[in-house]
Amino acid sequence: MKGSLISSAIAEPYAQALMSVAQAHNLTEQFGDDCRSLIAILEESRDLQGLILSPVIKETDKKAVLRRMMGDRTSPYLLNFIMLLVDKRRIIFLEEICQQYLTLLRKLTNTVLAEVTSAKELSDRQCRAVTDKIKDLTGAQGVEIKTSVDPDLIGGVTIKVGSQVFDASLRGQLRRVSLSLGGTA
């Protein structure tokens, strides 16, 4: 289910259609929250992935499970969209469609996605400081942070925004010192 070129090409028009529905009903942020939840569930649940990917499981069964999983809190527009994906046999692209939707939402709201890797878990205060720094560097109105921990960094953080990487880690500083001294990192 991870994004290949083909799945991206299939997912993009569906994500744009979902964005059109969300904008028409002023639900862009709610759909964004629901997409984030769906992505998290799909990444965590092998059983749900198996259900979605299985050609043996009937569409009616897939719909019943998805309806139960989505619950009453989900917008009927989003639920209908997901049921349409099942009918069109495009439900296997649900995760990619949600990713593409979030990309469109970030463009719409002038928000950047920052992948922050640190040597240890960041506190709320540190996350706010990183968010403020990213806003200053990019001029974005909002920042969506995806954090991960890599003890090999020794200390500090690396921040990836789009194709730019800001390396403020101790490992990166040691590598730069080594290179400046004529060594190989």
Swiss-Prot record:
Belongs to the ATPase delta chain family. SUPFAM superfamilies: N-terminal domain of the delta subunit of the F1F0-ATP synthase. Its main location: membrane. It is a peripheral membrane protein. This is ATP synthase subunit delta. The gene is atpH. F(1)F(0) ATP synthase produces ATP from ADP in the presence of a proton or sodium gradient. F-type ATPases consist of two structural domains, F(1) containing the extramembraneous catalytic core and F(0) containing the membrane proton channel, linked together by a central stalk and a peripheral stalk. During catalysis, ATP synthesis in the catalytic domain of F(1) is coupled via a rotary mechanism of the central stalk subunits to proton translocation. This protein is part of the stalk that links CF(0) to CF(1). It either transmits conformational changes from CF(0) to CF(1) or is implicated in proton conduction. Keywords: ATP synthesis, CF(1), Hydrogen ion transport, Ion transport, Membrane, Thylakoid, Transport. One of its GO terms (molecular function) is proton-transporting ATP synthase activity, rotational mechanism. GO terms for cellular component: plasma membrane-derived thylakoid membrane; proton-transporting ATP synthase complex. InterPro entries: ATP_synth_OSCP/delta_N_sf (IPR026015), ATPase_OSCP/d_CS (IPR020781), ATPase_OSCP/dsu (IPR000711). It comes from the Bacteria. F-type ATPases have 2 components, F(1) - the catalytic core - and F(0) - the membrane proton channel. F(1) has five subunits: alpha(3), beta(3), gamma(1), delta(1), epsilon(1). CF(0) has four main subunits: a(1), b(1), b'(1) and c(10-14). The alpha and beta chains form an alternating ring which encloses part of the gamma chain. F(1) is attached to F(0) by a central stalk formed by the gamma and epsilon chains, while a peripheral stalk is formed by the delta, b and b' chains. It is found in: Cellular thylakoid membrane. Gene3D superfamilies: N-terminal domain of the delta subunit of the F1F0-ATP synthase.
